[in-house]
Design a protein with these regions (language model features):
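Beta-lactam-recognizing serine transpeptidase/beta-lactamase-like catalytic domain environment
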Residues: 68, 190-203, 241-289, 294-522, ...
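Periplasmic/cell-envelope proteins involved in peptidoglycan metabolism and beta-lactam response
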Residues: 1-267, 357-369, 520-553
């Protein structure tokens, strides 16, 4: 090797040695001497991981009126490590966040916390005030809160949502999977002032919820609520009033109302959470003489009696040595008159002819003892004695609606089947679910089963018309229209406590509307179904029929 080559090799060696030494020095400087400066620079930026709430679907009545919707609001967040003066920030913010100042200060002064939620669905006025404060480290995400434009109307049907926007009661709960939508997610870089830097690193847009269209007609709902509100003041019932209006041919619920009720915009403002439940589907009661409609239909369909067959009603009937008393002595009457004038004595004789097996077959066929499957949450199945445990006296009292417990929705559904041609219809309160302009699920009228023949149904309709024109239901007559119905009065759990009820329909020749009214333990101005519940049903039928013949036509 020449001296020139050796010299050149040595120079290259020295050059690479110097370069490697320089890199080592730089690495030591980065890791040690300047580490605090770099840490400060890194600390001046952070990421914000935000869940993007979808818009909840609206709920509409059958005419397109909005029953539940969203109004602008905001979610408020904090990045405590970016808040320079937690005490001052707490003082300025707490009044807009429904939080006490001390609790807010604990959150804002916790520098170990990356991210904190201060408020969900904060009203828009408060959001605007929070934005105007311009506090570094406080973020606002525009969102929505639930609103019920009609206030208390349909409160137990609609239910309400929680602070997180999820449904808690009513249709808001049972149809939450359609209404809620799918949340999105945004991950963004934020600076030391808590402001977003550049475009989001990741963005998954939320998918908004579906809209629900109900069978409820808010006009008929309004008539129904007005009628029971007047009655509530007049009769002062201890346990409230329930009213249901149904299209008997389709099973569509046109109105469903209960008192007492609540405002779903402020659901916490109630004496008890019981106000949130829906007695129309979740409470049970002895139906009393309204149940005679069921017994009579079963007897006529089974051909154990004819409408004109004559009976003698002495005011009592003896079963297994026990004297079962009727409410009055009616003497010589036909079976039709026994329905019109509500003879317990005759119905005990009729159910003896039917027998346990046949009677229970019809009880089951009419849907008693089973949930109807309506879209509302909290429905119960009622109480029917086991057939194997029933005694003759039990059978006798069940014939006129005692010793059996039903729900209001069961009763109006069964009653509708008696007067609609004999078909038990599945009751439903949802007409369809839509996403944009596309219907994704439709709830069509559904025949569960045919319970009685059209001939029996026709016979029952005209017997029930006479109950209103000549019998116990006279207070339900509507001038200009034919009305049929049946009254009921049941002594409740304690002496002197009664459930006054009435089930009615109109017009008799072509029923468009069926209505059931329960007044539970009225304390003044009467207690019998004919004097308390029938006038309420009359007002609902009158207003609804006029509405159908004018506006709807």
């Amino acid at each position: 090797m020449t001296s020139y080559v050796k010299k050149r090799t040595f120079i290259i060696f020295i050059f690479f040695t110097i370069m490697i030494f320089a890199l080592i020095v730089r690495l030591i400087w980065i890791q040690g001497i300047n580490s605090s400066k770099l840490a400060m620079a890194v600390e001046r930026q952070s990421t914000a991981d935000i869940i993007l709430k979808p818009q909840r679907g609206n709920i509409y009545d059958v005419n397109g009126n909005i029953l539940a919707c969203n109004v602008p609001a905001g979610d408020v967040f904090a990045a405590p490590k970016f808040i320079k003066n937690p005490e001052k920030a707490s003082e300025e913010l707490y009044k807009y966040l429904n939080m006490d100042k001390d609790s807010l200060y604990k959150i804002l002064s916790n520098k170990n916390s990356e991210w904190a939620v201060l408020g969900r669905s904060v009203p828009l006025d408060n959001i605007n005030k929070i934005k105007s404060l311009n506090i570094p480290g406080i973020y606002v995400e525009n969102t929505f809160t639930r609103s019920y434009p009609y206030g208390k109307m349909l409160s137990q049907v609609l239910g309400f949502t929680g602070i997180d926007g999820n449904g808690l009661y009513g249709l808001e709960y049972s149809l939450d999977r359609y209404l809620s939508g799918i949340p999105g997610r945004e991950i963004s870089l934020v600076d030391a002032e808590g402001r977003k830097v550049g475009l989001p690193d990741k963005l998954h847009k939320p998918v908004n919820g579906d809209n629900i269209v109900l069978t409820i007609d808010s006009v008929i709902q309004g008539y129904t609520e007005k009628a029971i509100e007047k009655a509530y003041e007049k009769y002062k019932p201890e346990d409230g009033i329930t009213a249901i209006v149904m299209n008997p041919k389709t099973g569509e619920i046109l109105a469903m109302a209960n008192l007492p009720d609540f405002d779903p915009n402020n659901p916490q403002d109630v004496p008890s959470q019981e106000y949130w439940s829906n007695p129309a589907i979740s409470s049970i009661y002895e139906p009393g003489s309204v149940f005679k409609v069921i017994t009579a239909s079963a007897a006529l369909e089974s051909a154990v009696v004819t409408p004109d067959e004559r009976f003698y009603d002495p005011g009592y009937y003896v079963v297994s040595g026990r004297k079962i008393r009727s409410w009055t002595v009616l003497g010589d009457i036909t079976f039709s008159q026994a329905i019109e004038k509500s003879s317990d004595t005759v119905f005990v004789q009729i159910v003896e002819r039917l027998g346990v097996d046949a009677f229970y077959k019809y009880i089951k066929a009419f849907g008693f003892g089973s949930r109807t499957g309506i879209e509302l949450p909290g429905e119960v199945s009622g109480m029917v004695l086991s057939k194997s445990k029933i005694y003759p006296v039990d059978l006798a009292t069940m014939s006129f609606g005692q010793g059996i417990a039903v729900t209001p929705i069961q009763m109006i559904t069964a009653f509708s089947s008696v007067i609609n041609g004999g078909n038990l219809m599945a009751p439903h309160i949802v007409k369809y679910i839509e996403n944009g302009d596309k219907i994704i699920k439709e709830y069509k009228p559904q025949i569960v089963r045919q319970v009685i023949s059209k001939e029996t149904s026709d016979t029952m309709r005209y017997i029930l018309e006479k109950t209103v024109t000549e019998g116990t239901g006279r207070a339900a007559q509507v001038p200009g229209y034919t009305v049929g119905g049946k009254t009921g009065t049941t002594e409740n759990y304690a002496p002197g406590k009664y459930v006054a009820s009435f089930a009615g329909f109109a017009p008799v020749e072509n029923p468009k509307i069926a209505v059931l009214v329960l007044v539970k333990n009225p304390t003044q101005n009467g207690y019998m179904g004919g004097e308390v519940a029938a006038p309420i049903a009359q007002e609902i039928l009158r207003d609804a029929l006029r509405y159908y013949d004018t506006v709807k036509k």
